Amino acid sequence: QNAEYPRIIEAIKEGLERWPQGSFAVWYPIKQRRTLQHFLRTASKLPARTLLLAELLIRPDDSPLRLNGSGMLLVNAPWQFDQVLSPALASLRAHLGESGASHRLEWLKAPA
């Protein structure tokens, strides 16, 4: 898994070179969120207008042996997409989450 992240960054870079205004979505599993830090730091430097991070953990990310949640990196996300995702993530957490469930919605690059 971790070896795939540099390839994902390169693929997004290539996509943005060909289509700078294009929207791209990358799904990723979350076993332990701390393993994603380098990927997200690198992604935040991409030459995109906006970068939106949406994550749902159905349980705490304290075990690398199971899928604890998943995330989406949205490159050049549609306008006000965060306002659509916020209630959806809260609803999913309420219906699917176990004790310690959480969600995160964060602009790595906010709209200007």
What are these model-derived regions, one by one?
Residues 1-112:
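Class I S-adenosyl-L-methionine-dependent methyltransferase catalytic core
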